[in-house]
Regions:
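Active-site region of PLP-dependent enzymes
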Residues: 148-154, 161-280
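Basic phosphate/pyrophosphate-binding loop/patch that engages nucleotide-derived ligands
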Residues: 131-140, 182-202, 291-292, 296-307
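Conserved PLP-binding active-site segment in aminotransferase class I/II-type PLP enzymes
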Residues: 1-57, 61, 83, 108, ...
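PLP-dependent enzyme catalytic core of the Aspartate aminotransferase-like
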Residues: 339-412
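PLP-dependent aminotransferase-like
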Residues: 12, 56-145, 152
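Conserved small-domain helix->loop->beta segment predominantly found in fold-type I
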Residues: 212-225, 256-333, 412
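Glycine-centered flexible beta-alpha turn that most often forms the glycine-rich phosphate-binding loop
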Residues: 144, 310-363
């Protein structure tokens, strides 16, 4: 039996000291700043927590409106609700599947506090245009880059463009087994106010300099601190993030070159000057081309061994293609939570007394989002990333062409 460390024996933790300290989070934060060029970064427990921290930092609260998209994972709007504010949905661009900046402009009201675009599937939203729009109206852009941590716009890393950007480590392109995320900003005031949303008072007291922030340091954050085990893994992922992303881009470009001429399938669009991180490889299916539904085509793909899902339509409720969704899917404005407008009871936050113009969410509001949700299909990780290469991509192409060659068998 080992001698107690108290009396000169070896420490039980030994080299695992980092698992109980904060230095790994600090190293990750420094690495993120170096990687993106942003001045400040704070690791948190998830991408949702990063978004919620950013919204809190921007002063978003009861009665405020935040423009976002319904064509996304539910957490994008969930972070708005967590701050007791109201999501106002803008439609998407039919090519990039990201926020339509002109529709966002049309949705701005005196109650608009922020714009929350989503870099969906890894393609950046039109952040430069949205930043100009925000400047015109004195509002803040909180970018949801949870699926696009290694993307770029005109050579500038995502995380160094919007007023504040949220990252997530729960999936590609940077992954940590225990999850986690971070918010990044070049604005010291936003950085410090964001700490109040979920950091321990001792953390706030050690980082903040603003007397107003320090005054509220003991307000009782929600404990949105990142697990040090996740931080340890994320640091390693960050070291070769660009190399892995570039390999994934090569794989996806190979797919595009091979399937772009197949009738009925539209391969992903990449806006000039934008670097797509390819969290998913998302195509559009034309059901009229063959008289076969998108869901039937996806069933055939999965049967061939290619994992494919209709993300917006049902990924919030199922990830196994053979399982049944809990309820009808689709863009968020069609989901029960938004149609009923009673998340916290008594109509809050949608119908609370602070809301001047309670939103009504209904079918037909977002025609592009609604159409794309019925046509998209996504090829997922890990099929797109190293060690997969062109040989593996060709297997996916072979599966698709096999289905197209036998498409009449799928007609019902």
């Amino acid at each position: 039996m080992s001698k107690l460390a108290l009396f000169g024996g070896p420490k039980a933790l030994g080299d695992a000291e980092q698992l109980k300290s904060s230095w790994r989070q600090k190293s990750m934060e420094e690495g993120l700043c170096e990687y993106t060029g942003a001045k400040y970064a704070k690791c948190v427990s998830s991408g949702t927590a990063a978004l919620a921290s950013g919204l809190f930092a921007a002063g978003v609260g009861p009665g405020d409106e935040v423009i976002t998209v319904a064509y996304t994972w539910v957490a994008s709007a969930g972070a708005i609700l967590r701050n007791n504010a109201v999501p106002i949905f803008a439609d998407i661009d039919p090519q990039t599947l990201c926020m339509d900046a002109e529709d966002a402009r049309r949705k701005i009201t005196p109650q608009t506090k922020a714009i929350l675009p989503v870099d969906f599937y890894g393609h950046p939203a039109p952040i430069p245009e949205l930043m100009e729009l925000a400047e015109e109206h004195g509002i803040v852009v909180i970018e949801d880059a949870c699926q696009a941590a290694t993307a770029e716009i005109n050579g500038v890393k995502v995380g160094n463009i919007a007023h504040l950007t949220a990252f997530s480590w729960s999936g590609k392109p940077i992954y940590a087994p225990e999850g986690g995320g971070a918010y990044l900003t070049n604005d010291r005031e936003l950085f410090e106010r964001g700490l109040l949303a979920g950091q321990h008072p001792t953390v706030i007291q050690g980082l903040a300099t603003d007397p107003e922030v320090l005054k509220h340091a003991s307000m009782g954050g929600t404990g949105d601190r990142m697990n040090p085990v996740g931080a340890t893994a994320a640091i390693q992922q960050l070291l070769d993030a660009d190399a892995r992303t570039n390999a994934r881009i090569r794989n996806c470009e190979y797919l595009t070159a091979k399937i772009s001429d197949i009738p009925g399938i539209t391969s992903p669009y990449v806006r000039p000057g934008y670097k797509h991180a390819y969290h998913y490889y998302t195509c559009l299916w034309d059901p009229d081309e063959y008289g076969v539904s998108r869901d039937r085509f996806c069933q055939a793909l999965n049967a061939e061994g290619v994992y494919a899902i209709a993300y917006v339509m049902d990924a919030n409720y199922r990830f196994a293609p053979e399982s049944e969704p809990i309820q009808a899917g689709g863009p968020l404005h069609l989901r029960t939570m938004f149609r009923e407008r009673n998340l916290y009871g008594k109509g809050c936050p949608f119908l609370c007394p602070h809301v001047k113009n309670p939103p009504v969410y209904k079918a037909g509001d977002l025609p592009v989002s609604e159409e794309m949700a019925g046509r998209e299909f996504c090829l997922s990780q890990p099929d797109l990333s190293p060690p997969c290469d062109e040989k593996d991509m060709q297997l996916i192409v072979d599966a698709i062409t096999k289905i197209i060659d036998n498409i009449d068998e799928l007609k019902e």
